[in-house]
Swiss-Prot record:
The N-terminus of helper component proteinase is involved in interaction with stylets. The central part is involved in interaction with virions and the C-terminus is involved in cell-to cell movement of the virus. This is P3N-PIPO polyprotein. Belongs to the potyviridae P3N-PIPO polyprotein family. A motif (Involved in interaction with stylet and aphid transmission) lies at residues 489-492. Residues 773-895 form the Peptidase C6 domain. PROSITE patterns: HC_PRO_CPD, PV_P1_PRO. The record marks Y437, S438, G895, G896 as: Cleavage. Keywords: Host cell junction, Host-virus interaction, Hydrolase, Inhibition of host innate immune response by virus, Protease, Serine protease, Suppressor of RNA silencing, Transport, Viral immunoevasion, Viral movement protein. GO terms for biological process: proteolysis; symbiont-mediated suppression of host innate immune response; transport of virus in host, cell to cell; viral translational frameshifting. The keyword Hydrolase applies.
Length: 1152
């Protein structure tokens, strides 16, 4: 039968596996052989090494080499004594010797060390004395033995006297003792020779070893490695060789001279020793009394310490020999004090033996446990998760418990309904099936508590107390964790990776779903946690701090986006920062404050520059060199053929190709794709030229385009800001000022064509579109601009860019949008993705006849003669979004005309071109007398309800012109027009309703002012509130522009005069205001006087008719009462008694 003790070959181990059902491998066998070589015991089950001397456990040979400090067994002289020497020797008899001498020989030689036993006749009779053993003596010469007497001859018995016999006995004893001493000496020499031979390598190693101190304080020899010894031997051999080659011959030195001078002893000057002026230290060694305990004292000490540990629930460590130790702590379970030992499974290790308690330490652990609930009886149902390491009395447990081998039972876990002892060795299958009773919640709480206390703030000014319930605190902490992270388990790594991959918007959306419910839950169930509510509200405010007012951003860009001079440049930068909302960084917010400061300085010291320009001197030549595109030159973004690598951008570009491109089927030919129609006309693509003719004549004919009529250079070709040309937004001209006309553009397949200057750049379409031909749908040719911008977008931002372009830009642009809207959309995208501002655009052609922009794709154009737009980058194209830009092309459609193109999506702001305003008779800002006639129109409509209703319907913002004159504003307020405007437009136009409310408030304040100067100051102060309302988009109507101009003039006037008024100066404009007010009041007063006369006539006629009717049907008493009432009513109406109807009126009534 195979056993592991006689396992010398691998097949022995396999035979043992088959017999016992074990699974030992070759690795176990190798470790078993290694343990035999170093003299260790190998435990096959636990796969560990055990030292037979110190009983220490090691898991690998490296651990033995680094940590094993056990001393080897000492040698003894008995180890080298022969086995024969250890045998018991016969005791010689030293009594009288009777020697029988045969007759043949008179003299016989005695041999005490013969191998054959002596004859029974020859005996030594001695009592109580033993000198040594009678073993065989190692000798080379044989010892002659006494011959046996022959039977034939009779033996002679010699009787000697007693004295002679005694003397002979003494001589024999001396000889025997001398022989014994020689034997002992020989054996001793032999033993020491063997000892020297065995210790010679060890002693020779100590000659080169050094003495080192171990951790326990013992001094040991530390031998040097073999390579160091070899180097030392080689060096010694070299020195000996040199000594043999150049032997040293000693000589007597009788004179030493240093540089020919006197000897050193003569030149040396004797120096006096320095005097010590300090008191020497007197360090006295302190001798501590050594603590000595007997067994009784030691037990009492352990009892006292155990009581303290269990009561205070402190941690302790019982240390034994070398590295033997047991760690535990005091705890309470069901109100009983217990000892809880530190086990391996609580640290995350699953081992067959969970804890090893040395036999020498087990009584101490039991003694400490006895100070608690040692004598309490426990059942298995009282143990649950969290009970790991509890030390119980093995004789006091009842129920389903596993094997109990020791007096103490350490709880490990439960398997198959039984509670297992941590000291027991279990199989690997049980180890993995066992439900460990470690306290996961306690581990979490220990980590939380430790880190919480370690990071406690140091600047708390009060003493912290326990006011909240701990369970309620845990509930609120769980709510916060699930609100912010939303994990299925806090230990789940997949949830963490999923949370990490969320974008900023997705994360905000995810948190916003839960944060409202959490706030309501805390308010209702945990109202004391107000600090948590404040934190959640702050988080919600930060997450929702988005600026979705893209309309205001668009309007700002349209108004002043192209202005590069101060303060408009600061406003543009501020607008770009504000639109980011919560995505703006702290540095950007600091920059925003600086821009506000610059705007404030400008408003304080305002200046204006007048620029002039003329078409006669207009030149807008395009560069002959190609535009430098860094994205197409970076080696990291090019393949081995120099082509552009789309990377992740290729996948996200599908959002453009799927919705706004049409797949071309070459099998049906290209004829149906040749005509590119728009609402106002059409253009021929060069897609048919993809079928290339090899005939030179035919090929040359295909290179001839179809030209259209050239309108020449007109105001439609240029864009101005004031009188300054904005060249990127103008058509390209030659050096003589004539517009440059487009030529035929040859087609290509699967490319995106970029560049407006020099040679075009061909970029391969994304791999997602590989093998297919795409053409944009009608009305969506501007998608090529967004596709060109995608080239410069970083790969990790491609998803956000394409989603924003599709869901925000394209959704609002729709089909055939205006160039202003396209430029605004590009600016919004460039704000969130600044790298796209340098993106190179496809070539854009201008068709003034149909007021259309053509974005040329890879299929070119056969139609020629179009003007060429100079804008080559997104930054230059964005200038079309500025409202201050005076340009007809600003309102051209990218594929159609405003009156024939489909309606724009909801949310777009209606705009009118400058030429359209002139056609409608609208006066521009720079024309004189633009406010006065409209103010007169407002004054006429004050007391004409129908005219006022018509005015509010057509030009509602003319009401703001009333702030020019306090009298006009008061009349407008008294007429009730402001009140009617407020109520009528409350549902339809809240902006206009708010304007009427502000004017009503200003009228009330003006009515309380006593002087005209104060009234004008009140009106100028209220201009700021009206300006805030006018900043919202309101179109290009006449009333809006006039109101905006009037408010800005009043604000600027107030700001300029503020410093003078503050120091007490008065400006000359006060007299001017009096003249203006008098002139307006004169016209307005005449109208009021005429209205008063008409009112008197109507009122007298009405009273006369009433009086006649009453007199004809009343008695005299009632007539007199009626006369008094008529007089009183006249006084109330006219505030003068002489204006009341008198007796003539009554007399005429009586006569009638």
């Amino acid at each position: 039968m195979a056993t592991l003790d006689n396992c010398t070959q691998v097949h022995h181990m396999f035979a043992y596996n088959r017999e016992h059902g074990t699974n030992y491998t070759r690795n176990h066998f190798r470790r078993y052989l290694a343990a035999q070589r170093i003299g260790f015991y190998y435990d096959w089950d636990d796969d560990v090494y055990e030292c037979p001397t110190c009983e220490a456990i090691y898991h690998s040979l490296d651990d033995i080499k680094n940590w094993h400090e056990c001393d080897p067994p000492a040698f003894d002289l008995n180890d080298f004594i022969t086995d024969a020497r250890l045998k018991s020797a016969p005791v010689p008899d030293l009594g009288p010797v009777i020697i029988e001498i045969p007759k043949a020989e008179e003299k016989q030689e005695l041999n005490f060390f013969a191998a054959t036993p002596a004859p029974e006749v020859s005996q030594w009779k001695c009592r109580g004395l033993q000198f040594g053993s009678f073993t065989e003596l190692e000798t080379s010469e044989p010892v002659a033995s006494a011959p046996e007497p022959k039977c034939e001859e009779p033996a002679r018995t010699i009787a000697k006297p007693e004295e002679s016999v005694e003397q002979e006995t003494r001589g024999d004893g001396k000889r025997l003792l001398q022989a014994q001493m020689e034997v002992d000496k020989a054996e001793q020499d032999l033993a020491f020779a063997c000892l020297n031979a065995s210790l010679k390598p060890r002693l020779e190693g100590r000659t080169t070893a050094t003495i080192a101190r171990r951790r326990d304080g013992c001094l040991v020899y530390k031998t040097k490695p073999s390579w160091s010894q070899r180097r030392r031997a080689k060096k010694t051999l070299k020195v000996d060789t040199l000594a043999c080659e150049n032997p040293y011959i000693p000589a007597i030195v009788d004179k030493i001279s240093i540089a020919g001078g006197s000897s050193a002893s003569v030149m040396h000057e004797q120096q006096k020793p320095k005097t010590l002026h300090t008191t020497p230290s007197r360090k006295v060694a302190t001798h501590y009394k050594r603590t000595v305990m007997n067994q009784q004292t030691l037990m009492a000490f352990i009892n006292q310490v155990g009581t303290i540990l269990l009561n205070a629930e402190k941690e302790f460590e019982v240390v034994g020999c070398r590295k033997q130790k047991v760690t535990g702590k005091g705890t309470r379970h069901n109100g009983v004090r217990l000892v809880k030992l530190k086990t391996a499974h609580e640290e995350g290790h699953r081992r067959r033996v969970d804890i090893r308690i040395p036999n020498g330490l087990r009584p101490i652990v039991m003694r400490i446990s006895a100070r608690g609930g040692w004598h309490r009886t426990w059942t298995d149902s009282e143990l649950s998760p969290g009970s790991s390491g509890y030390v119980l009395n093995s004789s006091k447990i009842i129920g389903k418990f596993g094997l109990r081998r020791h007096s103490i039972f350490v709880v490990r876990g439960r398997v198959d309904g039984e509670v297992i002892d941590s000291q027991s060795k279990v199989t690997h299958s049980i180890t993995h099936r066992m439900v460990q009773y470690s306290d996961v919640a306690r581990n979490f709480w220990n980590g939380y508590s430790t880190c919480f206390m370690h990071n406690t703030p140091k600047d708390i000014l009060h003493t912290c107390t326990s006011d909240f319930d701990v369970k309620e605190c845990g509930t609120v902490a769980a709510l916060l964790t699930q609100t912010l992270f939303q994990f299925g388990k806090i230990t789940c790594e997949k949830c963490a990776i999923e949370y990490k991959n969320l974008t900023r918007d997705e994360l905000a959306t995810r948190v916003n779903k839960e944060i409202d419910g959490t706030i309501i839950s805390i308010q209702t169930q945990h109202p004391r946690f107000v600090h948590v509510l404040n934190f959640l509200r702050l988080i919600k405010q930060v997450l929702n701090a988005k600026n979705g007012n893209f309309g205001a951003f668009q309007e700002t860009e349209r108004i002043i986006g192209d202005r590069m001079d101060a303060p408009f440049s600061h406003v543009n930068k501020l607008n770009a920062i504000v639109i980011k909302g919560n995505q703006a960084t702290s540095d950007e917010m600091a920059q925003a404050s600086n821009h506000v400061l610059e705007i404030a300085r400008y408003l304080k010291n305002r200046t204006e520059n007048i620029q002039k320009g003329s078409l006669k001197s207009f030149r807008n030549k395009i560069s002959g060199k190609a535009h430098l595109n860094p994205s197409l030159m970076c080696d990291n973004q090019l393949d081995k053929n120099g082509g552009f690598e789309w990377g992740q951008r290729s996948y996200h570009a599908k959002r453009f190709f799927d919705g706004y491109f049409e797949t071309i089927d070459p099998s049906d030919g290209y004829s149906k794709y040749t005509i590119r129609r728009n609402p106002n006309g059409h253009r021929k693509l060069a897609i048919g030229n993809l079928i290339v003719s090899t005939n030179f004549e035919s090929h040359r004919r295909s290179m001839i385009g179809e030209s259209i009529e050239d309108p020449g250079l007109t105001n439609q070709c240029v864009s101005k800001e004031g009188d300054t040309f904005i060249y990127p937004c103008c058509c390209v001209t030659d050096e003589y000022g004539k517009p440059t006309l487009s030529e035929i553009k040859m087609p290509t397949k699967h490319h995106l064509v970029l560049g407006n200057a020099g040679d075009p750049k061909y970029v391969d379409l994304p791999k997602e579109a590989e093998g297919k031909m795409f053409v944009t749908k009608d009305g969506y040719c501007y998608i090529n601009i967004f596709l060109a911008m995608l080239v410069d977008v970083p790969e990790d931002q491609a998803k956000d860019f394409t989603k924003m372009a599709r869901e925000i830009a394209v959704k609002q642009l729709g089909e055939w949008p205006s160039m202003m809207d396209v430029a605004t959309a590009c600016n919004i995208l460039a704000t969130f993705h600044p790298d796209t501002r340098r993106s190179e655009l496809p070539r854009i052609l201008v068709d003034h006849a149909t007021k259309t922009f053509h974005v040329i794709d890879s299929y070119g154009s056969i139609t020629t003669g179009f003007h060429i737009l100079k804008a080559n980058t997104v930054t230059q194209l964005v200038k079309f979004a500025h409202e201050s830009l005076e340009s007809e092309m600003q309102h051209y459609r990218v594929g159609g005309e405003p009156d024939k193109a489909p309606r724009k999506p909801a949310g777009s702001v209606p705009t009118l071109g400058i030429s359209d305003l002139r056609d409608l008779g609208v006066e521009l800002e720079n024309e004189e007398h633009s406010i006065r006639p409209n103010l007169q129109r407002l004054i006429k409509a004050i007391y004409r309800p129908r005219m006022m209703r018509s005015l509010l319907t057509e030009e509602p913002y003319l009401l703001i012109l009333s702030i020019v004159s306090p009298g006009v504003l008061m009349a407008l307020y008294n007429s009730g027009s402001l009140e009617r405007t407020m109520h009528e437009f409350l549902q339809t136009d809240q902006r206009l309703s708010a304007t009427a409310q502000i004017l009503k408030h200003l009228a009330k304040k003006v009515s309380l002012a006593k002087t005209l100067t104060i009234q004008n100051a009140i009106l100028e102060g209220g201009a700021g509130s009206l300006n805030e309302i006018l900043d919202a988009p309101a179109g290009r109507s006449l009333s809006y522009r006039l109101a905006k101009q009037t408010v800005e003039v009043m604000m600027a006037r107030s700001d300029m005069d503020k410093e003078l008024v503050d120091v007490g100066f008065s400006v000359l404009r006060d007299q001017k205001n009096e003249l203006i007010e008098k002139k307006l009041s004169h016209g307005f007063g005449g109208f009021v006087a005429r209205t008063t006369i008409v009112w008197k006539i109507i009122s007298n006629a009405s009273l006369a008719a009433m009086a006649g009717y009453f007199y004809s049907r009343s008695n005299p008493n009632r007539r007199r009462r009626f006369e008094r009432q008529i007089q009183y009513l006249g006084w109330i109406c006219f505030q003068k008694r002489d204006l009341a109807p008198k007796g003539n009126l009554l007399r005429r009534s009586k006569e009638s």
